[in-house]
Regions:
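Positively charged n-region of N-terminal signal peptides that target proteins for export
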Residues: 1-4
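Bacterial N-terminal signal peptides
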Residues: 7-17
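Hydrophobic membrane-targeting signal helices
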Residues: 15-20, 142
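N-terminal Sec/ER secretory leader and immediately downstream segment
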Residues: 23-111
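Sequence contexts marking disulfide-bonded cysteines in secreted/extracellular proteins
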Residues: 74-78, 135-136, 163-165
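Extended amphipathic alpha-helical interaction segments
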Residues: 87-156
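A cross-kingdom marker for long, charged
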Residues: 155-205
Length: 205
């Protein structure tokens, strides 16, 4: 596939808006990315991204989730009713520290490159939920209050904090799973957030 001419500055602005120069210490090759396609089909790009690229995004989430000051930004992104397209990720990344922004910038570059030129990736929602339910069982054994936090549905601060804590604990469990399973789980979380992880019901389409 031949890439159309790109507007590198526009894509740079998409990934790195309003960051101080001292924070922009990245060496990312954006020359092969079709900016217009990324902006117009962000959700489709995520669905077509290669497994390795999705796992790179998981690793970026994992590292950021370990930082208390950054975890809440990620948790807001994975709330059941939150938008999780590329623009939403960018708004979240803007709230993170330089190291996490660097990881996400590299991960998104790979997602964009593979998602623009690749075919739709096979995805089994039932298998993804099975991976997440197994991770939830493990997290329940490791962490008191995990399931209570995971299944909370309120919009008050305590409920949101409980879901955030459960999200961080689940991500920590998923890191030890094979890449294939991590990718399945990540694709589900990108589409649905924490919705339906515990109750096992099929997602509405």
């Amino acid at each position: 596939m031949r890439w159309r001419p790109t507007t590198v500055l526009l894509l740079t602005a998409l990934w790195l808006p309003a960051w101080p120069a001292s924070a922009q210490q990245y060496e990312i090759d954006l020359s092969q990315i079709d900016t217009t396609a990324v902006l117009s089909s962000g959700g489709d790009v995520l669905r077509r991204a290669a497994p390795e690229a999705i796992d790179g995004l998981f690793q970026a989430v994992l590292h950021a989730s370990r930082e208390p000051g950054e975890a809440r930004a990620l948790c807001d992104l994975f709330e059941p009713d939150a938008a999780r397209d590329l623009a939403a990720f960018q708004r979240t990344v803007d709230r993170l520290g330089p190291a996490s922004r660097n990881r996400f910038a590299n991960a998104f570059t790979q997602v964009a490159l593979t998602g623009l030129q690749g075919p739709p990736q096979a995805f089994d929602p039932a298998a993804a939920q099975q991976v997440l339910r197994a991770a939830a069982v493990t997290a329940t054994l490791l962490h008191d209050g995990f399931m209570l936090g995971l299944t909370s549905t309120g919009t008050d601060e305590a409920s949101r904090a409980g879901r955030c804590r459960a999200f961080r604990q689940m991500v920590d469990v998923l890191k030890d799973q094979p890449q294939t399973q991590r990718v399945l789980a990540t694709r589900w979380l990108l589409a649905e957030g924490l919705t339906l992880v515990a109750d096992g019901q099929p997602a509405a389409r």
